[in-house]
Amino acid sequence: METQNLTVVTEFILLGLTQSQDAQLLVFVLVLIFYLIILPGNFLIIFTIKSDPGLTAPLYFFLGNLALLDASYSFIVVPRMLVDFLSEKKVISYRSCITQLFFLHFLGAGEMFLLVVMAFDRYIAICRPLHYSTIMNPRACYALSLVLWLGGFIHSIVQVALILHLPFCGPNQLDNFFCDVPQVIKLACTNTFVVELLMVSNSGLLSLLCFLGLLASYAVILCRIREHSSEGKSKAISTCTTHIIIIFLMFGPAIFIYTCPFQAFPADKVVSLFHTVIFPLMNPVIYTLRNQEVKASMRKLLSQHMFC
């Protein structure tokens, strides 16, 4: 519609990953395969933890939260992405774009804070084992879970607020396969220097600080592991290694995307694809392959339901 000779943008055109039809078909098949693994994999972890009375430790409670976040995160982007692969015109309304952006940052930040909580849990378990059951009691676990979900909500509200006050009256082509702050900001018909700085502070700097803090925490934990017996040391190192791998997979793409908002890189879409599709798949795979208790419980659960 026309208002004072300015066209108010009511929808965005997503340019997608590539313009090649053959490449789109290949990516469609690969993404569909990944997605069909992500959802069952994560829900299997949740169901396994809920159904096994032996998996009641805080570590498994937080692992269940992680699986839920991963499943939800992939659900925000992947289904629409698959539909767009089969559509000639990839259009998303302004409201749908803002909604997608909100849930992406809500769940993404929640997962980031969850990794911090899991690092705290491992620190208490390894560095203060005699006080572990007192500190990490069920009430504390639920409180920490509430805090991380609330933290993700606040972070997402800030991200959405950065977008809502911007005027969009010109170009409406988003050079991506989903709505995210860096691409949307570039379409605003006003100077966005301050907004991009705020985005760096809210997303990029926060991700970087959490990343460095987590690495420092696990460095301290690994140093303390030397005091454990051989059996305890092996299990602790395995758990910490798993967490460190997840940290790099989570924070690497996030830091790349949100600390460089002023310029676009050819690898941006590939990094975004990894962050939204590949990473949620890697979490359950890494945890189940490296955690003997979860693997044993999962095998038991599957055998019960397959041969009942």
From Swiss-Prot:
Belongs to the G-protein coupled receptor 1 family. GO terms for molecular function: G protein-coupled receptor activity; olfactory receptor activity. SUPFAM superfamilies: Family A G protein-coupled receptor-like (SSF81321). The keyword Nucleotide-binding does not apply. The keyword Cytoplasm does not apply. InterPro entries: GPCR_Rhodpsn (IPR000276), GPCR_Rhodpsn_7TM (IPR017452), Olfact_rcpt (IPR000725), Olfactory_Receptors (IPR050427). Pfam families: 7tm_4. Keywords: Cell membrane, Disulfide bond, G-protein coupled receptor, Glycoprotein, Membrane, Olfaction, Receptor, Sensory transduction, Transducer, Transmembrane, Transmembrane helix. The lineage of its organism: Eukaryota, Metazoa, Chordata, Craniata, Vertebrata. Disulfide bonds join C97-C189. Its main location: membrane. It is found in: Cell membrane. This is Olfactory receptor 4N5. Residues 50-57, 121-139, 220-235, 290-308 are cytoplasmic. Odorant receptor. GO terms for cellular component: plasma membrane. It is a multi-pass membrane protein. Residues 1-25, 80-100, 159-195, 259-269 are extracellular. It comes from the Eukaryota. The chain crosses the membrane at residues 26-49, 58-79, 101-120, 140-158, 196-219, 236-258, 270-289. Glycans are attached at N5.
